[in-house]
From Swiss-Prot:
It holds the Pfam family DUF480. PANTHER family: UPF0502 PROTEIN YCEH. Gene3D superfamilies: Winged helix-like DNA-binding domain superfamily/Winged helix DNA-binding domain (1.10.10.10). InterPro entries: DUF480, WH-like_DNA-bd_sf, WH_DNA-bd_sf. This is UPF0502 protein Shewana3_1622. Belongs to the UPF0502 family.
């Protein structure tokens, strides 16, 4: 499965709205266009026309990833996904996995902490450990659907990307290339170790001062 940026946005929106606003699902072309162009919870923010969304829908229909539905007495065509968890889908995911994949389709690479914070309307993760466990399962499938990106400089957590879209594959390849192209040399490593040691000493000093202050107040 390989999705364009527009196709990934359409699938992500259908997954999202199926969970967050089930009373409005399936979505009309107009509602889907509005969802694709939301200013919040989207990265990148897009400005798609209805014609562009329709093109993406037509392409997804050929890939058998969406289906059309029209209500009795209504001429408005509505769309629902066949991306996962339907009788026509090869991909079967838990609600937790759907939430993670949906967020990655809509907002690009994210850390487990970001995924937990942003998933409250899609799935109730108890903590980051639960997010990490779900990510691990998705990466260990026979056909992995997520990939871990190299840790960015100055960041504590690694980001993860979905493997359904062309953009995600390019990000993954570029990140690993960048990481391989700029390894730490010996001088950089020594400077980094010295800086870490200095910070550890400062933390220890502050802890001693705090302990002394607490003792004087007790």
């Amino acid at each position: 499965m390989e999705l364009t940026l527009h196709e990934a946005r359409v699938i992500g929106c259908l997954l999202e709205k199926e969970v967050t606003t089930p009373e409005q699902y399936p979505l009309s072309l107009n509602a889907l266009t509005l969802a694709c162009n939301q200013k919040t919870s989207r990265d990148p923010v897009l400005d798609l026309s209805e014609a562009q969304v329709q093109d993406a829908l037509d392409s997804l229909n050929k890939k058998r990833l969406i289906s059309e539905q029209s209500g009795f007495g209504s001429r408005v065509v509505k769309y629902k996904h066949r991306f996962c968890n339907t009788e026509f889908s090869e991909l079967q995911l838990s609600s937790a996995a759907v939430a993670i994949v949906c967020l990655l389709l809509l907002r690009g690479p994210q850390t487990p902490g970001e995924l937990r914070t942003r998933s409250n309307r899609l799935h109730d993760f108890k903590d980051v450990l639960e997010v990490e466990a779900c990510i691990k399962q998705l990466m260990e499938r026979d056909k992995p659907v997520l990939a871990q990106l190299p840790r960015e400089p100055g960041k504590r957590e690694c980001r993860y990307t979905e493997l359904f879209s062309q953009g995600a594959e390019q990000i993954s390849a570029a990140s690993f290339t960048s990481a391989d192209a700029h390894p730490l040399n010996e001088q950089d490593r020594q400077q980094l170790e010295a800086r870490v040691t200095q910070l550890e000493e400062q933390v220890a000093e502050l802890k001693d001062k705090l302990d002394s202050l607490i003792a004087s107040l007790s």
